[in-house]
């Protein structure tokens, strides 16, 4: 009887050690997929300034709400822009709650698209440009001829405090 208890104890010990080794290998395994920082949060608004700094660019940005559907219709009616139960034109309504400028860093290699007559017609004239060219546009220069001015608004994609992509919004 005693030898049976010893055998069971040894088997239990081996099972526990095997489970611990398996768990250590499984949960600490490196997938080998090192990915870049995500470029996620999308924010709509207007660029107030875009200045070059030592490591890239600094942007002062005025966020706004770009709403559509029921959200846009109700907000516009509450603001007296449309009659209650009437739809907003083009199914969107921009809400400017204030003009608090937020500061974002802009990666000098960020993807930027603006709207031009030479751009991709399937994407409303979307044309890639550099951050440097965007800074020139914000300063009133014309490195490219825009289809409509930047005050139509832009969408920025942000990772924490850094803009990694920026796209001009089309306004019909």
Positions of PLM-derived features:
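N-terminal export and membrane-targeting signals
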Residues: 1-13
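Low-complexity, intrinsically disordered/propeptide-like segments
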Residues: 11, 25-30, 137-140
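Core hydrophobic alpha-helical transmembrane segments of single-pass membrane proteins
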Residues: 11-21
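Generic hydrophobic/packing signal
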Residues: 16, 25, 107-109
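C-terminal region of N-terminal signal peptides and the immediate post-cleavage residues
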Residues: 20-38
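Solvent-exposed hydroxyl-ligand-binding patches built from regularly spaced Ser/Thr
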Residues: 32-172
């Amino acid at each position: 009887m005693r030898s049976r208890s010893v055998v069971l104890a040894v088997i239990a010990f081996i099972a526990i050690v095997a489970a611990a080794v398996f768990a250590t290998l499984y949960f600490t395994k490196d997938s080998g997929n090192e990915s870049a920082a995500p470029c996620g949060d999308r924010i709509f608004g207007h660029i107030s300034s875009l200045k070059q700094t030592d490591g890239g660019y600094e942007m002062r940005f005025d966020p706004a709400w770009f709403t559509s559907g029921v959200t846009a219709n109700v907000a516009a009616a509450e603001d007296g822009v449309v009659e209650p139960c009437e739809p907003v034109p083009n199914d969107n309504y921009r809400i400017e709650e204030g003009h608090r400028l937020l500061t974002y860093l802009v990666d000098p290699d960020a993807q930027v698209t603006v709207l031009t007559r030479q751009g991709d017609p399937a994407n409303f004239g979307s044309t890639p440009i550099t951050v440097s060219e965007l800074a020139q546009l914000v300063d009133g220069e014309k490195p490219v001829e825009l289809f409509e001015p930047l005050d139509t608004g832009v969408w920025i994609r942000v990772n924490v405090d850094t803009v990694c992509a920026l796209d001009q919004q089309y306004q019909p």
